[in-house]
């Protein structure tokens, strides 16, 4: 009987995603961001936020250059070995800008400092943490990069979706569960993803995202709108916990 019970415990496991505080992270009333917006008027709202952030960071104000955000601990677990491997090629060959915020391992902090000096018009890295700067990156960037080696749930991709910033993620853990890959034929999805923990696969995905941003504005705006309509609030997560407790009670 004990063995049967153990087998049932192993078999009947349920995953419930973290929730996001939709009061704190609300593009319609966030006190940290430059301009408020919602899923109806995001085109103008994000345009204004992007220009203000570019100016604040000392980057050239370019509406049609993709601005990619990174807010993270700078560790290998978060995929920064992949980022380090392709950073020079990405910045040298693509019309792209990066806004980086975080702290972590010295090798990655130094890497971002180096590239910020080498490509001052393309990358600005803040080594440290600022709640205000984090909110502004989520609200102002076009895309958000999160190439984690593993990620049990993750919150940054939920924040980026909430603010209409299209996530580019590796298909692992909670990232795979929360970001639906863009399908150019069915015009579905909320972001871009790559399966293998491989730097050039990540680079190819970033380049694909840049091409959609540049050449398929209708599809890009669809990604933003679908992402903003997702519900990853604590109310949703709490409802799933409640349903699971009810199921367990019925089982007993």
Named regions from a protein language model:
Residues 62-77:
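Conserved donor-binding/catalytic core segment of Leloir-type glycosyltransferases
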Residues 75-88:
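A conserved mid-protein helix/loop that constitutes part of the nucleotide-sugar donor-binding site
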Residues 18-19, 136-229:
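Catalytic binding pocket for nucleotide-activated donors in carbohydrate/polymer assembly enzymes
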Residues 94, 99-136, 193:
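Nucleotide-activated donor-binding/catalytic signature segment of Leloir-type glycosyltransferases, i.e.
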Residues 1-10:
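Single conserved hydrophobic/aromatic residue that forms the stacking wall/gate
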Residues 13-65, 196, 200-216, 222-225:
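Glycine-rich phosphate/pyrophosphate-binding loop
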Residues 68, 83-86, 98, 241:
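A structural motif in glycosyltransferase catalytic domains
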Residues 234-252:
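C-terminal alpha-helical cap of glycosyltransferases
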């Amino acid at each position: 009987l004990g063995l049967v019970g153990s087998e049932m415990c192993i078999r009947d496991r349920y995953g419930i995603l973290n929730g996001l505080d939709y009061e704190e992270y609300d593009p319609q009333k966030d006190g940290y961001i430059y301009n408020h917006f919602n899923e109806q008027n995001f085109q103008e709202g994000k345009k204004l936020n992007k220009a203000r952030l570019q100016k604040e960071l000392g980057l050239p104000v370019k509406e049609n250059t993709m601005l990619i955000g990174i807010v993270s601990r700078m560790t290998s677990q978060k995929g920064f070995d992949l980022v380090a491997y392709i950073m020079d090629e990405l910045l040298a060959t693509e019309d792209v800008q990066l806004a980086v915020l975080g702290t972590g391992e010295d090798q990655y902090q130094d890497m971002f400092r180096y590239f910020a000096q080498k490509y001052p018009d393309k990358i600005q890295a803040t080594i440290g943490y600022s709640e205000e700067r984090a909110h502004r990156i989520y609200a102002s960037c076009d895309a958000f990069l999160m190439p984690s080696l593993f990620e049990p749930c993750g919150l940054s991709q939920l924040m980026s979706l909430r603010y209409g910033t299209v996530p580019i993620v590796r298909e692992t853990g909670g990232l795979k569960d929360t970001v639906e890959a863009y399908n150019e034929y069915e015009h579905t999805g909320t972001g871009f993803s790559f399966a293998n923990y491989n730097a050039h696969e990540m680079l190819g995905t970033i380049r694909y995202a840049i091409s959609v941003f540049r050449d398929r504005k209708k599809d890009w705006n669809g990604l933003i709108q679908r992402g903003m309509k997702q519900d990853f609030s604590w109310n949703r997560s709490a409802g799933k916990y409640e349903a699971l407790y009810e199921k367990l009670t019925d089982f007993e």
